[in-house]
Design a protein with these regions (language model features):
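Small-residue-rich
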Residues: 37-66
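A generic N-terminal leader/anchor concept
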Residues: 1-43, 47
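Short, surface-exposed beta-strand-loop junctions and turns on beta-sheet-rich folds
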Residues: 18-20, 27-28, 169-171, 310-312
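Contiguous alpha-helical scaffold segments within structured protein domains
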Residues: 59-82, 87-89, 111-113, 162-264, ...
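An anion-binding catalytic pocket shared by soluble metabolic enzymes
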Residues: 2-17, 107, 111-190, 282-307
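Conserved hydrophobic core element of enzyme catalytic domains
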Residues: 228-337
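Terminal domain-start leader segments
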Residues: 1-12, 69-118, 122
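A residue-level signal for conserved active-site and pocket-lining positions in enzyme catalytic cores
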Residues: 40, 98, 154, 193, ...
């Protein structure tokens, strides 16, 4: 099946079922279907009134697909630090005042893919990425997005829920310094602690020790958490409980801090789906990714968005450099110039 010729589709890599491709026409629904497969595709704000996208057909794709097409020519425009610097200053002011512990500004880099290449080719590049990542995509005739994320929001099988805290970033060659970096450790523990506190009222939670996850081009701190829930809950319940974690949201997480984050993201022109939940449901098994390491398109115009956590010890120069490091990592993951 030639993905480049499909006018609409949804794709995800499931941890046990591999690559799954949904093809249209899609039926959209406010609730998941009683049976059969469905994709969950929402915005970061969780404001899509019909986030369940039910495909006309579901296809299992081979793990070893066709090689990606020749690299396209993309004209990238360097993002200006001015708007980011203003948002960073406002965040630091609120942190100093005790109103915030952490927040995550996200800023895109814009570009244009030159014909005859089309952005749907990016999906083929995502599929051929590292096996330690999860490709995902959603597209219509004129727009769409795809990504290669290492981060899961959760995997629900009955009452069992598995999730992770993935926060703190460095280059692999800096691991010796990274494991003792107070700023990166604090950023990670804010995320892990927040997830633990949100899950604990619902049952028994186990947590692994903090460790380093090496993804080749970047390293992160990771903590895995497992909940044995006292009661059965819907995927929507867990999505609203966990999204956004402080890895992409604000801590503390209140209506006011989330509204402020939404304003900051809008001012930085962050795509609506960046960092949003992206999931797949079938037969009571719901697997949900965090939509990062991604590219968005309308026509031939592209946006490559990255975010980074800001805490009390953050500096503008360090955070701006980290955003560039993450953009470069995304490009390498897609084998792009």
């Amino acid at each position: 099946m030639d993905i480049k010729t499909l006018t609409s589709g949804a794709l995800i890599k499931h941890p046990s079922r591999g690559l799954l491709l949904g093809t249209g026409p899609f039926r959209e629904s406010a609730e998941p279907p009683d049976s059969g497969p469905a994709f969950y595709i929402d915005t970061f704000r969780l404001d899509d009134p019909r986030p369940w996208k039910i495909p006309a057909a579901l296809h299992a794709l081979p793990a070893e697909g066709n090689p990606p097409p020749p690299a396209p020519e993309i004209r990238w425009a360097e993002p200006s630090p001015d708007a980011y610097a203003q948002v960073f200053a406002e965040m630091m002011e609120q942190i100093a005042a005790g109103q915030l512990m952490k927040s995550v500004p996200a800023i895109p880099q814009f570009g244009e893919m030159l014909l005859p290449h089309t952005p749907r080719e990016l999906i083929l590049r995502a599929i051929s990425s590292s096996p330690s990542h999860y490709p995902y995509a959603w597209w219509t005739e004129r727009e769409g997005f795809c990504g290669i994320t290492p981060e899961t929001l959760f995997h629900q099988q009955g009452r069992r829920l598995e999730t992770m805290a993935l926060a703190g970033t460095a280059r692999p060659e800096d691991e010796g310094v990274f494991i003792n970096d107070d700023k990166e450790i604090r950023e990670h523990e804010i995320v892990a602690g927040s997830i633990l506190s949100r899950l604990s009222p619902f049952g028994s939670v186990t947590r692994t020790a903090r460790s380093v996850l090496n993804l080749g081009t970047l390293i992160h701190f990771v903590t895995y958490l497992t909940l044995e829930s006292d009661e059965q809950h819907t995927p929507a319940h867990w999505i609203r409980l966990l999204h956004p974690t402080p890895a992409l949201g604000s801590q503390p997480r209140t209506e006011n801090t989330l509204a402020q984050l939404d304003d900051w993201r809008s001012r930085l022109r962050c795509p609506l789906h960046f960092g949003a939940p992206f999931g797949f449901l079938e037969d009571g098994d719901f697997f949900c990714l965090v939509g990062i390491r991604s590219l968005y398109w309308q026509g031939q115009r592209l946006a490559l968005c990255t975010g980074g956590g800001v805490v009390a010890s953050s500096t503008l120069t360090h955070e701006w450099r980290e955003l560039k490091l993450k953009r470069d990592t995304v490009r390498r993951s897609f084998h792009l110039p």
